Amino acid sequence: MKTIQLADAEKLEGTGYTLYRMLNPATVGSKKFMSFVVEVHPGSGIPEHTHGPAEVGLHVLDGEASVTIDGQEALVKPGTAVHVPIGSTIGLTNVGEGALRFIAALSPPIDVSICPVCGIEIREPE
């Protein structure tokens, strides 16, 4: 069994957010999916972007966000799951007073050349 702790995850600092690369081809050898824990500071967001050939699922753990997918906006809070279809454009803003935290799962895993916000360099696990 392969596991990874949040404290040990590769961390990407964006403007107003932190992305923890949890399960992916490099960390656990996954072939069909990758996942992240994402933290967004109050008032900050993640700009609109696409995930190329990947389908995405988001599950909100803490906080509130305004999420826009292909021009449709929704308010999400803890316990909400969001589906992002293949080829869709997504952006979000933390509209709560505290940190927004969510899990993002993508299938298939994508390379950084497709989505610099969340991609990885596809390589074999060490």
Which ranges hold each PLM region?
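Short acidic-glycine-tyrosine-enriched beta hairpin
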Residues: 71-86
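Conserved short histidine dyad/triad with adjacent acidic residue
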Residues: 36-51
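Structural motif
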Residues: 64-66, 73, 89, 99
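A short, N-terminal "cap"/entry segment at the start of jelly-roll beta-barrel domains
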Residues: 1-32, 47, 114-126
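Histidine-centered metal-chelating micro-motifs
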Residues: 45-47, 66, 82, 86-92
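Glycine- and acidic-residue-biased ligand/ion/polar-headgroup-sensing regions
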Residues: 54-65
